[in-house]
Amino acid sequence: VHLTGEEKSAVAALWGKVNVDEVGGEALGRLLVVYPWTQRFFESFGALSTPDAVMGNPKVKAHGKKVLGAFSDGLAHLDNLKGTFAQLSELHCDKLHVDPENFRLLGNVLVCVLARNFGKEFTPQVQAAFQKVVAGVATALAHKYH
């Protein structure tokens, strides 16, 4: 992912304020509610039958935290996203058989959650930088599929 110095600074500044536990759970929960077909990868998580059940599910929250932890690692290695996510790409491709389109969907949901959480601070410029990052992460996670 190619970001300008200004974009890298904007991403780092905002990400430093992100509560990974809360935002991760909300982003994954929203993915499962907005795109219900993604729930098939999380059948072991139990109750996912209603939006409230999904958003309140402790396993969804815990996995969302884990996902955002990996995303944080990616932010520390923006110049080597494919290497950073190589093992996760292989896991999601070979063992979990996740549709790589889901990575793009989750990235876009994450951007929505950041906008909701940060309001005016999430300027169009900050959004543009984050869109580049989530697109780069989605591409890196889909790398083993090609």
Curated annotation (Swiss-Prot):
Which PROSITE patterns does the UniProt record give? Answer: GLOBIN (PS01033)
Keywords assigned by UniProt, alphabetized: Heme, Iron, Metal-binding, Oxygen transport, Transport
The UniProt entry's coiled-coil ranges are none
- Protein name as annotated: Hemoglobin subunit delta
What residue stretches are annotated with the Globin domain?
2-146
What does UniProt list as this organism's lineage? Eukaryota, Metazoa, Chordata, Craniata, Vertebrata
Q: Return the GO cellular component terms, semicolon-separated.
A: blood microparticle; haptoglobin-hemoglobin complex; hemoglobin complex
Expression tissues: Red blood cells.
Regarding protein family, the annotation reads:
Belongs to the globin family.
What Pfam family is a match for this entry? Globin
One GO biological process term: hydrogen peroxide catabolic process
Quote the annotated effect of S9A. In one allele
Q: Relate the assembly described in the record.
A: Heterotetramer of two delta chains and two alpha chains.
**Residues the entry annotates as binding heme b:** H63, H92
MF GO annotations: haptoglobin binding; heme binding; hemoglobin alpha binding; metal ion binding; organic acid binding; oxygen binding; oxygen carrier activity; peroxidase activity
